[in-house]
Amino acid sequence: MHKYQTHFVEHSVVKILSSTGKKHIALVAGGMSAEREVSLVSSAGVSKALIELGYKVTFVDMGADIAVKLQEINPDIVFNCLHGTYGEDGCLPGLLNIMRIPYTHSGLLSSALAFDKIHFRSCVLKNNINIADSIVVSKSDHINTDPMKRPYVIKPLKQGSSIGVEVIFEEDDFNFTDYDFPYGEDIIIEQYIQGQELQVALLNGKALGVLEIKLLKNRFYDYETKYNEGFAEHVCPAPLPANLYKKLLIESEKIYKTINCKGPVRAEFILEEQTNKLYVLEINTHPGMTPLSIVPEIAAYAGINFTNLIEEIIKMASFES
């Protein structure tokens, strides 16, 4: 049994958090993805900020009947606090476009492009931005040897929060024939790049700053490291030469514009040790809003506190015609 599982939930759970306010916000979180718990932690801080800002807030733990529940609630805006499938992959934005309800974060196509690692890679390469070499491997290929020279990274095609990500080093006792494809029939195998982990926060198309991740325990920036204290040190701003810092901001804004994102985004890069070459790893159109999350931390460095960050995200709410 794998630690992180999707699960079907028939009925949404609705809870009124604040019954009066200037606008009615439906805070949609939880859901049916493997990132359910992260979403719920993010929603706790977001709900508090929305109430402080004077909004009427209804919390919705998303189930399969989400469309019916939203019709009953009739919100002015949906705050999309879902992570992973059904929210971050474009499903909820697509539904809200049909229902003509304004929502936060990126739209259907932008979310889908960023969430699918193959399509994201294609977008990045067309814009001459460096990305690690990779191949797609299917379960039906029945590969019984390493599909790429070690070290390499195994990634599910469509997961976030580093769920399902494994790094295979030269010394590891790992046989690819034993890999059981827990998150779908296809995976992406990516060249592992040793270097400096760098994160960029963006808000409404503008890069706010760069943060460095220094690993303290685990070998890579995995789920455990992202969501537990004491596994990584955050250095903000990242200690980089001015020209390199500026390049990161420019590259991030270019990707944001290419994919046509909206609201908050987090971009992940690696600065390769040997060549000093920058590689983009991914962008996240639904970055975490937990106490350990990177976008709120960089925003604070840029002079935007958490409550104001949530207000800015709300201001950009819209649906696609």
From Swiss-Prot:
ATP binds at residues 148-199. Residues 121-315 form the ATP-grasp domain. Its EC number is 6.3.2.4. GO terms for molecular function: ATP binding; D-alanine-D-alanine ligase activity; metal ion binding. Its cofactor is Mg(2+); Mn(2+). It is an enzyme of class 6 (ligase). SUPFAM superfamilies: Glutathione synthetase ATP-binding domain-like, PreATP-grasp domain. This is D-alanine--D-alanine ligase. It comes from Rickettsia prowazekii (strain Madrid E). The lineage of its organism: Bacteria, Pseudomonadati, Pseudomonadota, Alphaproteobacteria, Rickettsiales.
